[in-house]
Amino acid sequence: MKIINILFCISLLLLNSCNSNDNDTLKNNAQQTKSRKKRDLSQEELPQQEKITLTSDEEKMFTSLINVFKYTIEKLNNEIQGCMNGNKSKCNDFFDWLSEDIQKQKELAGAFTKVYNFLKSKAQNETFDTYIKGAIDCKKNTPQDCNKNNKYGDGDNLIEQYFRGVANDMSNRNSNEEIYQYLKDELLKEDNHYAGLTANWQN
């Protein structure tokens, strides 16, 4: 009888320990299921990040901004300190870098609005890009004729001075991020280069 009692106690202990493991496993499974549900719910609650895109006006303005600065750097590189002696890549690499970041493009297009609208009002029957490129070409090819009819400013080629001046200051920055920040800030300013651009016009 003693042996039966011992066997009975051992079997109870054995069953209890097996049941204990099952309880722990069930508890772990339940906790994992709860944490998965919480994680799934929290992921569902996160708003889908909207893809940033440019409006047609922003795209037009950004494209003009890039075209005008690239054209200025190409035509007047020997008058832009950081682009002299064949070092145009430093100046142009920024635009390649910028092509990857829609948010920065959007911000620059917005910052360029004031300059764009001012110069567009002076362009008369020409497109914006044609008008600005004409001012750059005049400086490059026939500087003595740039003041005729005050087309690019009263008594001076203010358009060329503006874009060359900003490009020159851009080229003195050390990184693409610094160039971006400078350009954005400069486009928003009402003094400095912008004041020089807008100061002397007859029409």
Curated annotation (Swiss-Prot):
Residues 1-17 form the signal peptide. It is a lipid-anchor. It comes from the Bacteria. Pfam families: Mlp. Transmembrane segments: none annotated. Induction: Weakly induced when grown at 35 degrees Celsius. InterPro entries: Mlp (IPR004983). It is found in: Cell outer membrane. An outer membrane protein that may participate in pathogenesis. Some human Lyme disease patients have antibodies against this protein. The Mlp proteins probably undergo intragenic recombination, generating new alleles. A lipid is attached at C18 (N-palmitoyl cysteine). Keywords: Cell outer membrane, Lipoprotein, Membrane, Palmitate, Plasmid, Signal. The keyword Lipoprotein applies. Belongs to the Multicopy lipoprotein (Mlp) family. A lipid is attached at C18 (S-diacylglycerol cysteine). Residues 26-47 are annotated as: Disordered. Its main location: membrane. The keyword Protein biosynthesis does not apply. This is Lipoprotein MlpJ. One of its GO terms (cellular component) is cell outer membrane.
